[in-house]
Amino acid sequence: MKVLAIFTCYNRRELTRQSMELLGQNKNVTFDYVIVNDGSTDGTDEMLAAMPYEIDLINGDGGLFWNRGMYEAIEHAKKVHPDYEYYMLMNDDTKFVPGIFDEMLPLFAPDKVMVGAMCGDDGRMSYGGIKYVKGIKYKKYGPEAQDICFD
């Protein structure tokens, strides 16, 4: 299975490299990339050029920031890469569990969105997700032993 990973980066060369290398450890899922490099001055361009992955690189001038960079990357992906089964939006500093997508592969389904829980370096949950109940009331969800599916 091929997944198009989409992210914006700025001056986090080593974190970006580590994130991409962790994704590369999956055996049954291949990742290609659309990346907005928003004016990095730390050698990110050179590092990305040396990576052994298929990368569409969009260069910004430092004024896109994360939100506009992601918009530009998503619009590019929709126009140039409409044939991918899955798009994955990520941050440039995400530390993926090695092989996690191989484990998640049986859960992939057409027309579904998957959201992974986020943990800090200390292993504590920092974000899982929320489900709106009514009005402004919601219930928080963290990483659980059992999968949670919402309609």
What does each model-found stretch correspond to?
Residues 1-22:
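N-proximal low-complexity "stem/linker" segments adjacent to membrane-targeting elements
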Residues 21-31:
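Short, acidic, metal-binding catalytic loop of nucleotide-sugar glycosyltransferases
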Residues 60-78:
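Glycine-rich, basic loop-to-helix element that forms the pyrophosphate-binding segment
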Residues 84-95:
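Short beta-strand-to-loop acidic/aromatic patch adjacent to the donor-nucleotide binding site
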Residues 130-151:
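Short, flexible, basic/aromatic active-site loop/helix in glycosyltransferases
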